[in-house]
Every structure is written in C-alpha cells, then in structure tokens.
Amino acid sequence: MLGTETVHALRGVDLQIRRNEFTAIMGPSGSGKSTLMNLLGCLDTPSSGEYWLNAQKVSELNDDELARIRNKEIGFVFQTFNLLPRATSLHNVELPLIYAGVGSKERRERAAQSLEKVGLADRMHHRPNELSGGQRQRVAIARALVNQPSILLADEPTGNLDSATSHEIMQVFTDLHRAGQTVILITHERDIAAFANRQIHLLDGKIERDVLTERAA
C-alpha cells in the first residue's frame, strides 16, 4: 500500500523456468526483480496467481512448509557472503546440513565435496578473514550447493567484487550449470547477465523482454 493506493510490484507475470536453465533476471530499481526473486525463493507468497516448483503448488503453503521447501529445494547466494567469521570454510558450508539434522560424518564429506566443486579444496580449514572476497563468495556458493538444491538462486552475487573476480565467480556458476545445475541470477549488470543462456528483462512489474542468448547455443 502507498497511502490509499495499492501498488503491485509484479503485474501479470507469466514465467516458466525449466530444469538446467541458466537464467538472468534484469531490470532497473523498482522493476520488480527483487519481488520476483523473493517469490521464486519462497521467501514470499503472491497476492494472486500461482507458483509451482517441481510439480508442487508452493503459493498456498504455510510458513513452516515454505521453510522446508527453501532448505530442500533452493540454494541462496547473496551479495554479502553471510559467513560466520570464526568458523572455517568447512564449518560454514556444513551449517545447512546441521539444520537438516545430517550426521557429522556425512556433513563433513558433503561439505568437502561442495568446496571441491567451487575450487576451494585447499581452503577448507581457513576462516573468512584468511580468504579473498572471491574465495568467500565461493564458500557461500558451496554452502548453497551442499543440500543439492533444485535451484541455485543468486542475488547480485558479484556486487561486492571487482570486475576480474566477478568474472571468476560467474565462471563458477557457468561450470555448475554445465554440470546440470539450474541457476537463476538477479543482476542489473549486462556483462554479468551475459553469462546466462536466457535473459528476462523486467520493467514496471512486467516482463519487457525474454530472450535466449548466444551462450544458449
């Protein structure tokens, strides 16, 4: 609500994202991309319409059910790395598995495998202050992957990184996509969106353009 007027952040959005797509969602401030990310990530529910994820109608789930979906189906990567400062890379990656009740031996094995996927096998026992910005984001990506989510949802994941490190991180996402991971990227940077094989442009709460890029070929 804005005064007595209802403002709809998204209007008439009809969108299907297929398994193993690498999709970038773009748009200026106020375009609705953050709202769309919150809906896709089950952080919010739509005021009307439906959202289906893996044949499940999640738009009608309660908060507890949405929390279970988020933990099981969605891996989040944010602009800020959100790592525990006193914990090692390995322990930071283990955290979602601790919440899921996974035993310690399996936790360590899966966290180590996840760090290996992002090229940090030699940094497992380092703390965040011993890592570069790019390495910290790799830890965050490994943490997002450790529950083997259906979707990797990245919100401005290179926003705190320089251009060279940003491209290194985007190559990690590209490699994960080529290995079969579905990736949804929220960004306002064209050079970052160019790594995706599909670009969705939002404007004033509507899909303005939805295009496949050359990278999809």
Question: Where are these predicted regions, by residue range?
Answer:
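ABC family nucleotide-binding domain
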Residues: 1-202
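ABC ATPase nucleotide-binding domains
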Residues: 214-217
